[in-house]
Amino acid sequence: GGAIGALFSATAIYLSSFSLLLVGSYFTGIYMSAHGFYRFAASDAASDDFRPKAISYVMAAGLASAIIGPQLGSVMFDALSIPFMGVYAATFALNCLGFVIFPFLTVGTAKNETKAPRVGRTRLEMLKTPRIATAIICACVSYSLMNLVMTSTPLAVVGCGFAKESAGHIVTAHVLAMFIPSFFTGHIITRFGVERVVGTGLFILMGSGIVALAGVDLPNFYIALILLGFGWNFGFIGATAMLATAHTVEERGTVQGMNDFMVFGLVTIASLTSGQLMNCSGGNPIEGWSAVNFAMIPFLTLAFASLIWLSLITKKAAKTEYLTEKFPE
């Protein structure tokens, strides 16, 4: 899908066809939605102990993308006779690498599984499972709030009188903060438990909002966006690891699909809402930036409440199991 989308887009640039560019973007969207499942593929192929680390390492690849992508785009922007055409040509070439790499990829667990009729719980029953519901809520909140704030950041930075270059540097620092922790997030999850890591991520997101609301100087923007990146990493990777342990093998495709549909659907809404919040005070950037960060409060409250709910239910179940074993009927 990515290669086809890039090919259509490059052709659209060459022919100056906006309609063809939309077709290319459609295929690119399909590709983008599919590659989000790489983290689940790594999780499904890993052992129980290595699963959080596998998810974390896949997400860490985003660091290379964050560094290589912009540089490649700058180099290829005018590499061909028509601006942007070289960018799509490079994208086509990168996607074609998958045809070389994936034939050599073997996932051992797939060989041991036999196809069987779909059995088990309905989607609604799955969503009523405390661990699945909590994982999806925390993933949605972590990703959506990160996107909500990040989308408005360049507008707020420039609107507060700082240079566009400063806005770019702040976003770069944020992206690095999103992916650098991935090299050790999995180890932290294994050591301290997924619920604590997700909770820590939510606290860091809250800290990001507090710093942002404390002032509109450059240090505030830098610190807030770096914290936003760290909070997203712990919250989203932790929630993904939590979800991976909350369903059966037969249910994983359905659960993973529901999760990503909700997460990225809400991310889209957050992106659109971000601009509206920035404009809610008639275009005043300081008041708009405050509105964006105040909007985090109810959603963080929901995520914290879901984690507390899960903790109480888990403790109650453990206590019941202990009493049953100690005092059998």
Where are these regions (language model features)?
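C-terminal ends and interior cores of transmembrane alpha-helices
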Residues: 1-15, 204-216
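Helix-loop-helix hairpin linking two adjacent transmembrane segments in secondary transporters
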Residues: 18-20, 48, 57-103
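Cytoplasmic helix-loop-helix junction between adjacent transmembrane helices
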Residues: 24-60
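A membrane-interface helix-boundary motif in multi-pass transporters
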Residues: 75-93, 276-300
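Helix-to-loop junctions at the C-terminal end of transmembrane segments
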Residues: 77, 181-194, 278
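C-terminal membrane-cytosol helix-exit motif in multi-pass small-molecule transporters
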Residues: 92-113, 306-311
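Juxtamembrane intracellular "pre-TM" segments in multi-pass secondary transporters
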Residues: 107-136, 325-329
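A late C-terminal transmembrane helix in Major Facilitator Superfamily
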Residues: 250-283
